[in-house]
């Protein structure tokens, strides 16, 4: 008996069966990539996709972003029919576009329209990173330009939420032309005395960061957003120097005078309301 008490017992672990795994619907839980906390996805969405534990700002779709900023029942989408093609006959590009259209329900990587923020009218454009990583091709540039022109014609403040991997490589020079196209439209808005508020979210990189996203009368960003043109590794290899750990973060850019403010998502609507009230 004593021998049995002190003998080493084998330990066993129960491995859930495939059937047991399937009982938990996919997407019901979300793990925070910052603090590793596991939470109900619906609770995360209720908090505007901001982690209650560490404050990490999770990715939002364009529709979710609009719902969080624009007053209920006031958003009117514009230019929804504009969508890109495959002008350079890039292999597999059309299939990828169609796949993203089915996945997101969008024709392109930006949603544009008009709405109100606590009663103040705005023209708004929101990029959706779930569609080709919100890269800017001809259609995205066209929709943004039309939104800018609408703000110019109606003398209504323009609000753009940027989130992009940069220019869309499958469209070559046509995608790069959108940098100049959107910037020229913003210059016309500026000459007309219009107000442009730019909010950069994670990530805002490449040709988008080097064009319209950085040309606001006010340039804001969400906390910890990655903002920059070239990648960190490319820059380090070019200048042969090690970059600071927080390089290309919203906080780094704010410290070096390239942003006006870093605004937590839960404070975004209130902050924008105060700003719009100042410019009435």
Curated annotation (Swiss-Prot):
Role summary: Component of the acetyl coenzyme A carboxylase (ACC) complex. Biotin carboxylase (BC) catalyzes the carboxylation of biotin on its carrier protein (BCCP) and then the CO(2) group is transferred by the transcarboxylase to acetyl-CoA to form malonyl-CoA.
Gene Ontology MF term list: acetyl-CoA carboxylase activity; ATP binding; carboxyl- or carbamoyltransferase activity; zinc ion binding
Pathway recorded for this protein: Lipid metabolism; malonyl-CoA biosynthesis; malonyl-CoA from acetyl-CoA: step 1/1
Key words of the record: ATP-binding, Cytoplasm, Fatty acid biosynthesis, Fatty acid metabolism, Lipid biosynthesis, Lipid metabolism, Metal-binding, Nucleotide-binding, Transferase, Zinc, Zinc-finger
SUPFAM superfamilies assigned: ClpP/crotonase
Protein name: Acetyl-coenzyme A carboxylase carboxyl transferase subunit beta
Cofactor note text: Binds 1 zinc ion per subunit.
Binding residues for Zn(2+): 32, 35, 51, 54
The protein's assembly and partners: Acetyl-CoA carboxylase is a heterohexamer composed of biotin carboxyl carrier protein (AccB), biotin carboxylase (AccC) and two subunits each of ACCase subunit alpha (AccA) and ACCase subunit beta (AccD).
PROSITE patterns, sorted: COA_CT_NTER (PS50980)
GO BP term, pick one: malonyl-CoA biosynthetic process
Residue span(s) of domain CoA carboxyltransferase N-terminal: 28-280
HAMAP family hit by this protein: AcetylCoA_CT_beta (MF_01395)
């Amino acid at each position: 008996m004593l021998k049995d008490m002190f003998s080493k017992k084998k330990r066993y672990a129960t491995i859930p069966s495939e059937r047991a795994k399937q009982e938990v619907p996919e997407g019901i839980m979300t793990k925070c990539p910052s603090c590793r906390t596991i939470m109900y996805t619906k609770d995360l969405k209720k908090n505007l996709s901001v982690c209650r534990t560490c404050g990490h700002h999770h990715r939002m779709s364009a529709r979710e972003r609009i719902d969080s900023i624009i007053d209920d029942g006031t958003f009117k989408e514009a230019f929804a029919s504009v969508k890109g093609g495959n002008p350079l006959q890039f292999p597999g590009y059309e299939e990828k576009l169609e796949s993203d259209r089915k996945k997101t329900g969008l024709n392109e990587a930006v949603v544009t329209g008009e709405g109100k923020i606590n009663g103040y009218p705005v023209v708004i454009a929101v990029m959706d990173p779930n569609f080709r990583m919100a890269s800017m091709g001809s259609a995205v540039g066209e929709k943004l330009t039309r939104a800018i022109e609408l703000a110019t014609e109606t003398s209504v403040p323009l609000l753009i939420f940027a989130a992009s991997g940069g220019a869309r490589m499958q469209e070559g020079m046509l995608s790069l032309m959108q940098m100049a196209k959107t910037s020229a439209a913003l210059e016309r808005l500026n000459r007309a005395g219009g107000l442009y508020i730019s909010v950069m979210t994670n990530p805002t990189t490449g040709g988008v960061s080097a064009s319209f996203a950085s040309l606001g009368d006010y340039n804001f960003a969400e906390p910890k957003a990655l903002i920059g043109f070239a990648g960190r590794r490319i820059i380090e290899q070019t200048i042969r120097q090690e970059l600071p750990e927080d390089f290309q973060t919203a906080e780094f850019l704010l410290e070096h005078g390239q942003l006006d403010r870093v605004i937590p998502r839960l404070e975004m609507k209130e902050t924008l309301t105060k700003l719009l009230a100042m410019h009435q």
